[in-house]
Curated annotation (Swiss-Prot):
Tissue-wise expression: Highly expressed in brain, heart, kidney, lung, skeletal muscle, spleen and testis. Detected at lower levels in embryonic stem cells.
Domain of life assignment: Eukaryota
Gene that specifies this protein: Mbd2
Name of the protein this chain belongs to: Methyl-CpG-binding domain protein 2
Record text on subunit structure and interactions: Heterodimer with MBD3 (via N-terminus). Component of the MeCP1 complex that contains HDAC1 and HDAC2. Component of the nucleosome remodeling and deacetylase (NuRD) repressor complex, composed of core proteins MTA1, MTA2, MTA3, RBBP4, RBBP7, HDAC1, HDAC2, MBD2, MBD3, and peripherally associated proteins CDK2AP1, CDK2AP2, GATAD2A, GATAD2B, CHD3, CHD4 and CHD5. The exact stoichiometry of the NuRD complex is unknown, and some subunits such as MBD2 and MBD3, GATAD2A and GATAD2B, and CHD3, CHD4 and CHD5 define mutually exclusive NuRD complexes. Interacts with CDK2AP1. Interacts with DHX9.
Gene Ontology molecular function: C2H2 zinc finger domain binding; chromatin binding; DNA binding; identical protein binding; methyl-CpG binding; mRNA binding; siRNA binding
SUPFAM superfamilies membership: DNA-binding domain
Amino acid sequence: MRAHPGGGRCCPEQEEGESAAGGSGAGGDSAIEQGGQGSALAPSPVSGVRREGARGGGRGRGRWKQAARGGGVCGRGRGRGRGRGRGRGRGRGRGRPQSGGSGLGGDGGGGAGGCGGGSGGGVAPRRDPVPFPSGSSGPGPRGPRATESGKRMDCPALPPGWKKEEVIRKSGLSAGKSDVYYFSPSGKKFRSKPQLARYLGNAVDLSSFDFRTGKMMPSKLQKNKQRLRNDPLNQNKGKPDLNTTLPIRQTASIFKQPVTKFTNHPSNKVKSDPQRMNEQPRQLFWEKRLQGLSASDVTEQIIKTMELPKGLQGVGPGSNDETLLSAVASALHTSSAPITGQVSAAVEKNPAVWLNTSQPLCKAFIVTDEDIRKQEERVQQVRKKLEEALMADILSRAADTEEVDIDMDSGDEA
């Protein structure tokens, strides 16, 4: 407790923003220029002397920039009285103005951060808080951000009943930006895509869903698939490690020291075929499983198999024209390499050793210009037959249409 001139005292519990009710207070901390002022009237008994305080003034000094001043009149005579009280009010943070204090002598008010003592009690006028100057510590915790609510709209990408709302921020550093929210049919609010995915579960696939626009973006799904396809960790999974670069010695050194490599065959090199590594493993000569199967048309009539040229002859055990046809057809569709057949002449002696697995089971053949000319003639004949069939179909349809028109005209005349 600190004494002040004029008979007032400053209470230690008031130094943090309380005001004694017996006087007027004006003051504030380093962030407040000036608080409120007030006067009070109340009887102030003095022990042993039956007198009332005539006039008292208090000046309070605390941990604030400006001290409080106060004065009160309470009757006749001379004497000193004390007025103690606590200021009550609402505010945020330390050092904000408070008002509406009450004390022993009555009601009083003052600025938060000031304290004063004097005689009497009364009601002090309330003053509006002064804005904080530049360089101050601020008014305390920040309040809610001002926003402008948008209109809730239906979201066609989500199940029926889901609403989308876009709220625009009106204050702060991010003024002008917008936040997107989604509302379920029951009224539950969702602020992010993970929350939406956890709530919907497997009911809706949100992999290509754009949270801001509320639409399904197929390009987003393609990017995710492409990223997974180009992921080096995904590519190296299940593949042999053929990296021949030397590792770095794991020693405590600031310089990278490679490991010395010793080999008995310095000229050896590891050959790699990236195309072969990307191919899926398959059974050798799997075309033999198609043996004995035949295709049929819509009328369940077996389609006659095509005849191979005389230059194509099968090779190997158990080879026939049907197996050779399926082998050549699969090689044409699944491989981009040229088809040459089994070129090695030793394949007839020992097929298990000299057989080329990347070529169909047929002898080596040579395509001549005569073969190409015959094939072109066959193609022209087939195209001519197709043209004749299409023209006949068009004429038959036109005739049917004319008959229908004649029947309708005769019905109208009747």
